[in-house]
Amino acid sequence: SYGMINKVCVGASAHFIAAQAGIEVPEDAKFLMIRIEKYGKEEFLAKEKLCPVICITEYETWEEAVANAKTNLLNEGAGHSTVVRSFNKEHIDYAGEQLPVSRIGVNMIGSSGLGGSYDNGLNPTATLGCGSWGNNSISENLWWHHLVNIARIAITIPETKIPTDEEVWG
């Protein structure tokens, strides 16, 4: 039915998916690329597909591209991950400030790199926390320290000086 991923396409090859859609592609095609013009709830393909279908779109400014990505993420995927392609630090920082994700890969492969890699500092895992955006308790890669119970002993320190509001807030 329209609006749902066809289960037979999940994990299938690009050639198989194209055949399901009545499109001829070489048997060794690695992925299908589709141009979309809408975002978020207005575009069925602007969400997780679990198959080798890549959607592309045009944009005029970096801010427009980030806004479109944010619309898609808020529809499906908030808290998870994204990848940006840029060597402009201001663009990278802007994406980091605007996008509701727990991981932003910069100029890397997201499907394997954001699950942790020796060259990006993320803990290797198959479980990616999505934080409160995704109704998870963690917003980082699940790691052994999340599975260890730690007891902390707290003892009142009598000589502690409690700061005034002025000292705290200036």
Model-predicted regions and their roles:
Residues 1-15, 44-48:
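Flexible, acidic loop-helix segments that line cofactor/substrate-binding pockets
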Residues 3-5, 21, 34:
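Hydrophobic transmembrane signal anchors and adjacent membrane-proximal interface regions, especially
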Residues 18:
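Substrate-access "cap/lid" subdomains that shape
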Residues 23-170:
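Conserved C-terminal structural/oligomerization subdomain of aldehyde/semialdehyde dehydrogenase
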